[in-house]
Amino acid sequence: MLFNSFVFIFGFLPAALIAFYATGRWLGARAAAVVLSLASLIFYAWFRPRDVPILLFAIVFNYLMGQVIQRARRLDRPAHAKALLVIGLVVDLSLLGYYKYANFVVDNVTAVTGSDYTLHHIVLPLAISFFTFQKIAYLVDSARGVVSGTGPVEFGLFASFFPQLLAGPIVHYSEIIPQLRSPTFSRLMSRDLVIGLVIFAIGLAKKTVIADTLAGYADPLYLHAAGQTWDLGRGWTAAATYALQLYMDFSGYSDMAIGLARMFGVKLPLNFHSPLRAASIIDYWRRWHMTLQRFLLAYVYQPIALPMNRWSAERGLTGWSAFTAGIAVPTLGTFLLSGIWHGAGWTFVLFGLIHAVYVLINEIWRERRKLINRRRRKAKLAPLVIGRWEIVGYHVLTLFALGFTNVMFRATSVADAWAISRAMLGFDGVGTAGYTLPVDLGLILAATMAVVALFPNTQQIMEKFRPAVNAALWTGTHQPPLMWRWRPDAKGIVFAGLVLFVAVIFIQRGQAVFLYFNF
């Protein structure tokens, strides 16, 4: 059951809303939370019932581990809490590792050793990458003393809440629980329903009208790419088409998740904020899958960087040696993990490593500029200021770099990725493949790029209503040329109704799975 399906929009969602608010009115918020948790499990089971025991195990195990870790903290036994945390992490990561990476590891080992050993095909449980990271964050926060006093009902809802269960955002316990404990939780608020519906409608339109349309052009280009004839035009058409498909697909999902949660009176953290407007790779990663990057920064990068920086300082390292120890090593480790988190394949390994190199180049450039400005200040000269056209140049360079990594992200093999990438670099010539950009695809690409560059994103349209937990962090930043904000007046209602109507009409072409469901 997909968010972009008739059975969800006209069946499951209304039933879940009615059951939730009716239970809250007559039996109270705690009972309403139980009902919403059960609805979330039904939603999850609709895809593949056999995955439900894995999700339930993850919920029960991590709740119990969280309880004993928190108890150890209360008894002032930090070593005990740390040991319990290690046990919890080993179990969670072992579960993820078996289901997601066992086939990949065995296939590569047998290829190297020449063994004929085969492993039965392991089906990846839906959303295991997302809910595993969410549970890991909960356990680590419990060990750090950030989380305490967890109840089974509220944890069950936190761990299964269907709007964010399948593809994020990866939420922190501290972001959701205060809302579940609020006196207004499960109390019907027409404001939340309307705001949530508008956000959901915008996200649905991004998915059904734009992303799924682009998929019809992107998929044939990437099918057996290594066996096709490529040139510069065809290569960049494939890169741009998939890049915009992925952008609108994930942007649409992120909007729908926030909108659905808001209908139930819950605000989720922002997970997507116009990343293609970024003028650097570092800024891009601040805007793309924001909660995943937050997780990696807090639970991977910093635990590597802090001891590496201490080690560097103790040995008096400076210059490139200090940079390598304190920044390069943590960055490479973090982005390598980010790559393989997305998928078990060499294309994802390369995706992570290339992005690590991009980020390190960006860091070196920023540090170099800071050094120049420090020297200019000492010489009593005005510091270098980034001009408008320089920003445009950075933006174009960022998009150019992303074109290659998006190919890695989409290609089914390294050979396919290389076939397209070498064409994008001009190695296969210009016009040699006899490829001509279809007029309709050209118009769709131009219109989509105009929407991305010129129009406000959903958070900016709904800025007045604080659509996300952390929306205030981005308020007033990076205003687009054609700014418009939604209001609950006649124009606003007509806009929302028209967007929802068009989005639903486009569902009739077929219901495509969200791209991030594959991770």
Which residues does each predicted region cover?
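Membrane-embedded transmembrane alpha-helical bundles that form the catalytic cores
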Residues: M1-N518
